[in-house]
């Protein structure tokens, strides 16, 4: 497996809970995207919602037209909580910054980072790609959280 393992929980303002994990219903789907899709299929209002994720929401993707950060911003969610910033192994993620720039509250729970990273040891144990030498235009770079 050459993609991050990520889980997400979305909680609407009225307390509805939706979960998702990477590659749950399609090979290119991210965890946040899965939770958003379930919420929308249920007719939930996502404005003002909070989404919790084990990893920073992506800021760029090759496999889809919208990043998870963009999906969150588009739906006017209020808050994003995640355990670990996406490691600079494949692409330099700017999800946290794009969310903050859009006025979304961001909370990083660094106390849970170790567990989130352990779930991805299959990727993090290999050689590290130099993020300065790699760009988000690399054909497979933005799909590693798929």
Place the predicted regions along the sequence by residue.
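Acidic helix/loop or adjacent segment enriched in Glu/Asp that either coordinates divalent metal
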Residues: 22-40
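Short, basic/aromatic recognition patches
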Residues: 1-2
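Short helix-loop-beta connector
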Residues: 44-49
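A structural microfeature
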Residues: 18-19
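Residue-level signal for inorganic ion chemistry
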Residues: 7, 58, 99
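Zinc-dependent deaminase
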Residues: 63-146
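Short beta-strand scaffold segments in enzyme catalytic cores
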Residues: 5-14
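Local cysteine-cluster metal-coordination motifs and their immediate loop/turn environment
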Residues: 25, 29, 51-73, 90
């Amino acid at each position: 497996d050459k993609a991050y393992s990520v889980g997400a929980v979305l909680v609407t303002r009225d307390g509805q809970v939706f979960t998702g994990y990477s590659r749950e219903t399609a090979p290119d789907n991210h965890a946040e995207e899965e939770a958003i899709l379930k919420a929308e299929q249920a007719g939930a209002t996502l404005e003002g919602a909070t989404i919790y994720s084990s990893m920073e929401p992506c800021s760029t993707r090759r496999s889809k037209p919208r990043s998870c950060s963009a999906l969150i911003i588009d739906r006017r969610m209020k808050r994003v909580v995640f355990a670990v910033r996406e490691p600079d192994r494949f692409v330099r993620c700017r999800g946290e910054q794009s969310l903050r720039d859009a006025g979304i509250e961001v909370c990083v729970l660094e106390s849970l980072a170790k567990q989130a990273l352990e779930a991805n040891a299959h990727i993090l144990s290999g050689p590290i790609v130099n993020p300065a030498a790699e760009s988000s235009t690399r054909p497979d770079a933005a799909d590693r959280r798929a």
